[in-house]
Amino acid sequence: ITVVGQCIGAKDYEAVKKYTKKLMLITYGVVWAMTLLMLLFSKQILSFYSLSEETTTMTMEVFIVHGICAVIVWPLAFALPNALRAANDVRFTMIVSLLSMWIFRIGFSYVLAIYFNMGILGTWIAMCIDWFCRGACFVIRFARGKWKNISFIDN
């Protein structure tokens, strides 16, 4: 992300887009690889623990939900905002992250896990909803280019 900050300092916004896209592709590649390894070796990973059959089944469900969400939206929710922060768009990323966490991750966790009786799977689904909402906000912000006009020096 340092290179993105340098391009912003040089006001080379096409390079910012180019390097952000490149870094996002790398992030997607790493997330895909890590998720694939996690899913391929999930039984071996779980064998380190003395889990009941019910807990093992539940954990596998969580692995699958996490894996699907991670490969689709995790980079948008957690890597893309780094490019926005490099452009000094820190207030927006902080507000979106806090609101999304409190409304979607915590609020929906309660609703899905307790009210709809989904248990831990509901909590993980709520986390994926949080990632999706963050990612959508950050993609829209980056695409609109408002980050180009944020000053680095307060007057």
Residue ranges of each PLM-predicted region?
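Residue-level recognition of transmembrane alpha-helices
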Residues: 27, 63, 97-98, 124-128
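Alpha-helical transmembrane segments of multi-pass membrane proteins
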Residues: 53-77, 99
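Alpha-helical transmembrane segments of multipass membrane proteins
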Residues: 36, 79-83, 106, 110-111, ...
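Transmembrane helix-loop junction
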Residues: 6, 47-48, 61, 86, ...
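Small-residue-rich hydrophobic transmembrane alpha-helices
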Residues: 1-42, 74-97
